[in-house]
């Protein structure tokens, strides 16, 4: 197996693949007579293709153990996919650059408390992978007709592990 070290999730390193979703004081302002702070426009939700619409769903995922064998990644050519945790539990985010229609070398990130991600349209990524305990997520992605899922199975799997 090919070793794949986990690194902390950061805005700058994740930027080529989408958005890190977390409170950002630079994009905040008070609403509701000052009783609420709005953290505004934290992710670009993308939907395209026939009858495209934005979906909001809830997921409850069981935890995975590290080290983890990564055999497959997927992508959604017709829309982005956001995962926003409802708990402070970390989760693993694996992404890979596109190299001629196939995934390149994957990168593994672990989220910090309260961080979510929006994986941009057509970006190769791993499946939702909660760590340490069962976790619930709000998922924002695309509905509508058309094929919005491509999968790629690696010839040689990766072993995702803490550095």
Swiss-Prot record:
InterPro entries: RmlC_Cupin_sf (IPR011051), UAH_cupin (IPR047233), Ureidogly_lyase (IPR007247), Ureidogly_lyase_bac (IPR023525), Ureidoglycolate_lyase_dom_sf (IPR024060). GO terms for molecular function: ureidoglycolate hydrolase activity; ureidoglycolate lyase activity. Belongs to the ureidoglycolate lyase family. The gene is allA2. This is Ureidoglycolate lyase 2. The keyword Nucleotide-binding does not apply. Homodimer. It catalyses: (S)-ureidoglycolate = urea + glyoxylate. Its EC number is 4.3.2.3. GO terms for biological process: allantoin catabolic process; purine nucleobase catabolic process. Pfam families: Ureidogly_lyase.
């Amino acid at each position: 197996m090919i070793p794949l070290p986990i690194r902390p999730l950061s805005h700058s390193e994740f930027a080529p693949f989408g958005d890190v979703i977390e409170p950002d004081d630079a994009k905040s302002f008070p609403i509701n007579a000052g009783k609420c702070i709005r953290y505004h426009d934290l992710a670009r939700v993308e939907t395209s293709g026939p009858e495209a619409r934005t979906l909001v769903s809830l997921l409850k995922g069981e935890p995975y153990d590290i080290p983890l064998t990564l055999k497959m990644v997927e992508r959604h050519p017709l829309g982005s996919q956001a995962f926003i945790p409802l708990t402070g539990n970390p989760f693993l985010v694996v992404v890979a650059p596109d190299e001629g229609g196939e995934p390149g070398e994957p990168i593994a990130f672990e989220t910090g408390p309260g961080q979510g991600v929006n994986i941009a349209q057509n970006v190769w990524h791993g499946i939702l992978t909660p760590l340490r305990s069962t976790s619930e997520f709000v998922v924002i992605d695309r509905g509508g007709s058309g094929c919005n899922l491509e999968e790629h199975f690696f010839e040689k799997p990766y072993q995702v592990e803490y550095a």
